[in-house]
Amino acid sequence: MAGTATYEAQPSPTPADQNSHDLFSYETTYTFDSDFQESKLGHGNSLYNDFSYDHRFLITGKWYLRLGVEYERYDFDGTDNGLPDKLQAVYGHIAFEYVVKDFPGIGIELDPGVYYQEHISGDNFDIPIKAFVSFPLKKDKIFAVVGLGWSLFQDPPVAPGGGIIWVFSDKLRLQAVFPKPALIYEPNDDWQLKLLGELNYLGVRTDDVVSPTEHKLDLHNAVLQYSEYRAGVQIGYTGIKHLKLIAGAGCTIERDFDFFRAHQSKRTDPAPYVRVAAEVKF
């Protein structure tokens, strides 16, 4: 005689994790030659390279611990005016984030490392900190972003950031968020077009600066905040699984060597730039 059928309640399936866990990125940006605003400093150009790798560890829900490493470097060529010929930084990433479909909505990040010119010492150590939170102003359409950053080698040491994200449609959105605002158009799943502005900067402690033309730049272990203000166009291609290829060009409006503690700032005229970059996520 057949037994009575029994049923066991099955636990509901765990929602699939829609976020990438391994994140690689590489960028190189070349700014062509332009004159310094003080003619006695001559002219110069810059080459920027950046590599980073991060891994996200799921904590619970959509909260993650992200750990990684990054190397940044600027190389400068042109007139021998005593300004640094390179700036470098090697640092870690320690971040706690709330992530939805690979977009962090809340986060705090520490970047402990050495920020230097040529030689590494204890004086080069810094722990920049940045934190942000985003929240909806109009559901699925308009979002506000509020951020704050701190670093020993920047002026001011505490600086605000943030702005507005406005989603006009599935294909067009405005990310008016400082320091990298952009208007983004995505005609399909494979292509992305950006009109962008950006402030890219790095604060370091330099070696001795000795200038043959500007003795106010004769400085010992000075703190330098180097900045590039850019505006341009960028194209991204994501038709290859896990890979995004990026090419861009535009104008570096100004490059600024700011020895803010010595009250010396040396700026350049505008010059064109070109960029190639790649991102891998899986």
Spans of model-derived segments:
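Repeated loop/turn-to-beta-strand initiation elements of outer-membrane beta-barrel proteins
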Residues: 59-65, 102-108, 140-145, 171-174, ...
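Solvent-exposed loop/turn segments connecting transmembrane beta-strands
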Residues: 40-45, 84-86, 117-125, 149-158, ...
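Outer-membrane beta-barrel "beta-signal"
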Residues: 162-165, 171, 233-241, 268-282
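Outer-membrane beta-barrel strand-turn architecture
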Residues: 18, 55-61, 98-104, 135-139, ...
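Transmembrane beta-barrel domains of bacterial outer-membrane proteins
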Residues: 4-122, 126, 221-230, 263
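Transmembrane beta-barrel strands of outer-membrane/channel proteins
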Residues: 24-32, 67-73, 108-114, 146-150, ...
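Outer-membrane beta-barrel translocator/channel fold
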Residues: 71-82, 179-253, 258-265, 272-274
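Membrane-embedded beta-strand positions in outer-membrane beta-barrel channels/transporters
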Residues: 46-52, 89-95, 128-132, 143, ...
